[in-house]
Amino acid sequence: MKVRNSLKSLRGRHRANRLVRRKGRVYVINKVQRRFKARQG
């Protein structure tokens, strides 16, 4: 999992990217291309 300052640009890189909030943190998850998994931090 990568840690990024801005997830908005990362979200646009693949069609299946989803922005989710869990426990106060923001994540990008992708069930098709798992290499796009990231956390904002």
UniProtKB/Swiss-Prot annotation:
Keyword list, A-Z: Ribonucleoprotein, Ribosomal protein
Top-level lineage group: Bacteria
BP-aspect Gene Ontology terms: translation
GO CC annotation terms, alphabetical: ribonucleoprotein complex; ribosome
Membrane spanning residue stretches: none
GO MF entries: structural constituent of ribosome
Keyword Ribosomal protein in record: yes
Any coiled-coil regions, as ranges: none
Family statement drawn from the similarity comment of this UniProt entry: Belongs to the bacterial ribosomal protein bL36 family.
Name of the protein: Large ribosomal subunit protein bL36
